[in-house]
Regions:
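Short, charge-rich amphipathic alpha-helical segments embedded
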Residues: 145-158
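Charged, helix-prone or intrinsically disordered regulatory segments positioned adjacent to compact structured domains
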Residues: 52-131, 160-162
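Short basic helix-loop element that most often maps to the first helix and adjoining turn
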Residues: 4-26
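Short, charged, amphipathic alpha-helical segments
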Residues: 134-142
Length: 162
């Protein structure tokens, strides 16, 4: 999914218009919506400073906006192949279902990814058990790794996200 699609997704999630978001970022009122439309459609790509400003206004991590190319199934497959090469991601089958798992023996990066995925699973389990709301879960995901308690420099999460 391209950065423009992520901007669009989070803008709608926050109930903002293109004009409002553009003006909040400092674009002139006359062209704010056009400028945002250019970023959302991919005809323009925001530089790092604008990506950081967008993330701040949209209340997400800049990492939530910048994701690999998963716009097509082929792009997604190559992303998974790269994860296999670099992080020990393995595909298997269990009870007729496709499963992805991390081979922690591959290298220290694979072990770290395994820890991060385990933390994600813990948050998902809290959501499934009703211990946290969908909003709290989404806040954890969209601000990752800010509220990840397994990270050394993690900030204190909102109530319920521990």
């Amino acid at each position: 999914m391209a950065i423009g699609e992520r901007i669009h997704f989070f803008r709608l999630l926050r109930g903002m218009t293109q004009k409002y978001l553009g003006m909040t970022l400092g674009f002139p009122e006359k062209s704010a919506d056009v400028r945002l439309a250019q970023y959302e459609t991919g005809s323009r790509t925001p530089k790092a400073d604008l990506t950081a400003a967008l993330a701040e206004v949209l209340d997400v991590s800049p990492h939530a906006l910048s994701v690999p190319d998963i716009d097509s199934y082929v792009g997604l497959m190559h992303t998974l192949f790269t994860l296999e090469d670099n992080y020990g991601l393995k595909i298997s089958e269990m009870d007729g279902e496709i499963c992805l798992k991390v081979d922690v023996r591959k290298n220290k990066d694979a072990a770290r990814l395994h820890e991060m995925l385990w933390t994600w699973r813990e948050q998902a389990a809290k959501l499934e058990a009703g211990e946290i709301s969908q909003e709290e879960y989404d806040r954890w995901r969209y601000h990752y790794p800010e509220y990840d308690s397994s990270q050394i420099r993690a900030k204190m999460p909102p109530e319920g996200l521990i």
